[in-house]
Swiss-Prot record:
Increases the formation of ribosomal termination complexes and stimulates activities of RF-1 and RF-2. It binds guanine nucleotides and has strong preference for UGA stop codons. It may interact directly with the ribosome. The stimulation of RF-1 and RF-2 is significantly reduced by GTP and GDP, but not by GMP. It comes from Enterococcus faecalis (strain ATCC 700802 / V583). Residues 10-278 form the tr-type G domain. This is Peptide chain release factor 3. HAMAP family: Rel_fac_3.
Length: 524
């Protein structure tokens, strides 16, 4: 081992970026990568004509449609920290992938559009992060455009999300009138157009004000900001590191990711307060320290065809303890089998490099020949640990699926099983006829499934909508095939567990009344 484990762990910052679609999440990710020297030019996220696709949107359909449908993992160094960013899908149809990703991070950055405020998907994702009790940092984006009043945005954030907020900076104007940021925490003003100040971006504050001979000092917008800040300091919440660490207070930063304004200040301040890797909970209720000597981690994502030319499959592992060393032997907890971790990579979206050592907080990619499932625990030696189960979600949309070309059955089956293991869709088979049914939480999931089956597996599919909207599992010992009727569909999931698909709540209630001793269960 060539690294100091404690120093290495303490330098890690592993976080996810969450937002509603189009709030600017992918753009801010790219600006952070730019500061870390990981890329030379930020791609215009939806610049389909220029071909400058977002670095974190690597799948072909993401480039075509300008949306993130998979979670990307990116690592870079900045100052004395090693940063692991997990860029998650903002589209609500991909909430399953996002929720699982949020189990692999130590903090989260919430990006909000200054014109729109808190949106539906932001609220959903925030609740998942809040439940985990990890720190949440807020970046209110798009100051280069006209948006809502900053005080109004803070009030909405506190009311809708039930969390204290502390503004780290405050906008001096917005849109065409944007002059800069009053940096409360660092006691300086950050100028939007430094050329108006001899090229100097920052003006230090003295007694909360800038020198009176500067043109900005007499600006009415700046004078209004001084009043706003005074009000915030007197009437607002006090800055509390303890509350931030518990996820009870969110530091709020304003800026513009597109024009790269306020992003570097955000990054540097974020790194001061974002936590290093923490202890992870086990299924038995215990915890494993990141400084534990023996290696352990869990699979939170499986991705097929990251390199379509090689038709490969990668299991993404969050390291929780110990030091990963190339070629080490570990135990796969679910099966008890020994596995050699020899061909392991780290990522920049779809680009990767071999890794020889990694520690708690790092995300590594293990080549998967079909051994792994989402939620698997890997451990070294005699640890015999099992980490908490990752969330699964009950689909609300269902389709019957068949191969368009019967000669492509082999490709059809391979594609379906790989995409199911990724967690891209859920698969069921009708109990007697073994017809394939796929389930999703949103319509876009079906579109991506159809696209990937055709483009990655050369297996076009025919999808037939079903009336079913509710899936409920039952205990195998309660199953009687006579329970199947015109009001439901009896099926098995991929673990061979029986379930019923119902068209609506009325059909579900009818079943529950007829079989009162049978417990109907949902996933989450």
């Amino acid at each position: 081992m060539t690294i100091n484990q404690k120093e290495a762990v303490d330098s890690r910052r592993t976080f996810a970026i969450i937002s509603h679609p189009d709030a600017g999440k992918t753009t801010i990710t790219e600006q952070l990568l730019l500061f870390g020297g990981a890329i030379r030019q930020a791609g215009t996220v939806k610049g389909k004509k220029t071909g400058n696709f977002a670095k974190s949107d690597w799948m072909e359909i993401e480039k075509q449609r300008g949306i993130s449908v998979t979670s990307s993992v990116m690592q870079f160094d900045y100052q004395d920290k090693r940063i692991n960013i997990l860029d998650t899908p903002g589209h609500e149809d991909f909430s399953e992938d996002t929720y699982r990703t949020l189990m692999a991070v130590d903090s989260a950055v919430m990006v909000i559009d200054s014109a729109k405020g808190i949106e539906a998907q932001t609220k959903k994702l925030f609740q998942v992060v809040k439940k985990r009790g990890i720190p949440i940092f807020t970046f209110i984006n798009k100051l280069d455009r006209d948006g809502r009043e900053p005080l109004e945005l803070l009030e909405e954030l506190e009311e809708l999300l039930d969390i204290e907020s502390y503004p780290m900076n405050w906008p001096i104007g917005m849109g065409k009138g944007l002059e800069g940021l009053y940096d409360i925490y660092n006691e300086r003003v950050e100028l939007y157009r430094p050329e108006n100040n001899g090229g100097e971006r920052f003006i230090p504050l003295k007694d909360g004000d800038i020198p009176s001979d500067l043109p900005l000092h007499n600006n009415s917008v700046y004078q209004q900001v001084l009043e706003d800040v005074e009000l915030l300091v007197e009437a607002g919440d006090e800055f509390s590191e303890e509350k931030i660490a518990r996820g009870d207070q969110t530091p709020v930063f304003f800026g513009s990711a597109l024009t790269n304004f306020g992003v570097q200040t955000f990054l540097e301040t974020f790194l001061q307060f974002a936590p290093a890797p923490h202890a992870h909970k086990t299924e038995e209720g215990g915890e494993v320290s990141p400084y534990e000597k023996e290696f352990s981690g869990f699979v939170f994502k499986i991705q097929a065809n990251m390199n379509p030319a090689h038709r490969d499959r990668i299991a993404f592992v969050r390291i929780c303890s110990g030091v990963f060393e190339r070629g080490m032997d570990v135990t796969l907890g679910r099966t008890g089998k020994k596995v050699k971790l020899s061909n392991v990579t780290q990522f920049m979206a779809d680009a990767r490099e071999n890794v020889t050592e990694a520690v708690a907080g790092d995300i590594i990619g293990v080549y998967d020949t079909g051994n792994y499932q989402i939620g698997d625990t890997l451990y070294e030696g005699k640890m015999n640990v099992q980490y908490e189960e990752l969330p699964s979600f009950t689909p609300e949309l269902f389709m019957k699926v068949t191969a368009k070309n019967v000669m492509k059955q082999k490709s059809f089956h391979k594609g379906i099983y790989q995409l199911v293991q990724e967690g891209a869709i859920q698969l069921y088979k009708t109990y007697l006829t073994e017809e394939y049914i796929i389930g999703a939480v949103g319509q876009l999931q079906f579109e991506v499934f159809q696209y990937r089956m055709s483009n990655e597996y050369n297996a076009e599919v025919v999808m037939t909508p079903m009336g079913s909207k509710i899936a409920r599992w039952i205990n195998p010992e309660d199953l009687d095939e006579r329970m199947s009727s015109s009001r439901n569909i009896l099926a098995r999931d991929r673990f061979d567990q029986p379930l019923f698909l119902f068209e609506n709540q009325f059909a579900e209630r009818w079943f529950a009344d007829k079989y009162p001793d049978v417990e109907l269960k949902s996933l989450m």
